[in-house]
Amino acid sequence: LGQSGCGKTTLLRLTGGLETADSGEIRWESAHKTAFVFQEPRLMPWLTVWENVVFGLSKKETDPGKIEAVGLSGLEKAYPSQLSGGMKQRTAIARALAYEPDFIMMDEPFAALDYFTREQMQKELLRVQQERSASILFVTHSIDEALILGSQIAVIEKGMVKALYEVKAPQEERNLLEDEMITLKRDIINNLHFI
């Protein structure tokens, strides 16, 4: 979590091996089946929604439920040029979920989505995380989104982790109007120097 330009995306790209660090190292405890969702959907324009989602998977690994889970049923044969920005992003999310990863890296994946679709995607992400015990490194500039989705929230400023917060309430019981959430949000805002 952090303001624009603070190093959130760079951290994600370093963790995913898309960039190399100037110093230090990132270690993995074991091999992970990893998926990446970028800020901008990276779809192949010559493939349909369905073909983009199942690209690289064997026939037995394909699950039409992933398209349904992101609210794109009926658009399987559509091409990216026929989709809105939010629909393209949901296609990219479905592709990541179809891979059934153990580790998902997501760079502001819900930023282009309307409120209702964002809420639906947050619930689906939590379901996948609980069902698969998947670890998720989620980059956002939304404090509310971090509080709803995160178990640990790292506040980044100028490329450094400035503060680390643990959200103790079970995810299915989280309410942004509860005292714990209000207190955490206030602490995070104070750490980000918004006030």
Model-found features: residue ranges?
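Conserved H-loop
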Residues: S133-V139
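Conserved signature/switch motifs of ABC ATPase nucleotide-binding domains
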Residues: A78-S81, Y99
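Conserved beta-strand-loop-alpha-helix hinge in the C-terminal portion
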Residues: K158-R186
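Hydrophobic anchor residue at the start of the ABC signature
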Residues: I93
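Helix-to-loop junction immediately C-terminal to a conserved catalytic motif
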Residues: G16
